[in-house]
């Protein structure tokens, strides 16, 4: 829709970095679809984590707190997307990093606990291994890539967008692996 309305250029952002994720859903009329869908996604994340922790018996208070902050940060980010007030800018810039940090850390801790403490012997070890490797890679990659996302790079303007699009794709891949794991 953003391309159709001329809000972003026509390209493959994962490869070309022509637009940020937030720009795709920031402006009317696209934001009338993007924001509600992101809020539904946030609620879906709550149910995902609640059910996944329950099914895999990896229920810990610390992980629950991180997940709570992750989801609240995403909701605040979405609510303030497209707003021009000072506090909105703070939530747009900081909220998304809080969401990413707590999501990736939660994914890592849950994967680590499931992989190394495989108390439920019916758990498929290969899915647990892939989830653990992916979550560890996301955690290490996030630490390495964070300075690139924070500093201004004039000669490579699209690099931040390329990193963001692909990083979020990998975060979603973790959830896909969870689905495949639970399905088996």
Task: Identify what each model region corresponds to.
Residues 1-11:
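Alpha-helical transmembrane segments of multi-pass membrane proteins
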Residues 20-42:
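Interfacial helix-start motif at the membrane-water boundary
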Residues 30-38, 61-64, 91-97, 131-134, ...:
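Transmembrane alpha-helices of multi-pass eukaryotic membrane proteins
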Residues 34-47, 99-112, 167-183:
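Hydrophobic cores of alpha-helical transmembrane segments in multi-pass inner/ER membrane proteins
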Residues 47-69:
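Cytoplasmic juxtamembrane regions at transmembrane-helix boundaries
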Residues 53-54, 79-87, 145-156:
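Juxtamembrane "helix-exit" motif on the non-cytosolic side of transmembrane helices
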Residues 70-125:
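Membrane-proximal helix-loop-helix units in multi-pass membrane proteins
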Residues 110-184:
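Terminal transmembrane helical module of multi-pass membrane proteins
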């Amino acid at each position: 829709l953003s391309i159709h309305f001329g809000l972003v250029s026509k390209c493959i952002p994962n490869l070309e970095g022509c637009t940020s994720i937030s720009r795709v859903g920031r402006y009317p009329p696209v934001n009338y679809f993007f924001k509600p869908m992101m809020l539904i996604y946030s609620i879906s994340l709550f149910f995902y984590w609640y059910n996944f922790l329950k099914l895999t018996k990896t229920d810990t208070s610390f992980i629950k707190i991180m997940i709570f902050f992750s989801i609240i940060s995403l909701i605040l980010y979405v609510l303030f997307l497209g707003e021009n007030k000072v506090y909105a800018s703070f939530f747009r810039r900081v909220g998304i990093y809080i969401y990413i940090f707590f999501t990736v850390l939660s994914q890592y801790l849950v994967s680590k606990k499931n992989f190394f403490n495989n108390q439920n012997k019916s758990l498929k070890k290969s899915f647990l291994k892939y989830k653990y490797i992916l979550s560890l890679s996301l955690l290490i990659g996030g630490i390495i890539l964070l300075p690139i996302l924070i500093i201004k790079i004039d000669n490579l303007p699209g690099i931040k967008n390329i990193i963001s699009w692909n990083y979020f794709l990998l975060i979603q891949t973790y959830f896909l692996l969870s689905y495949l794991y639970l399905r088996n």
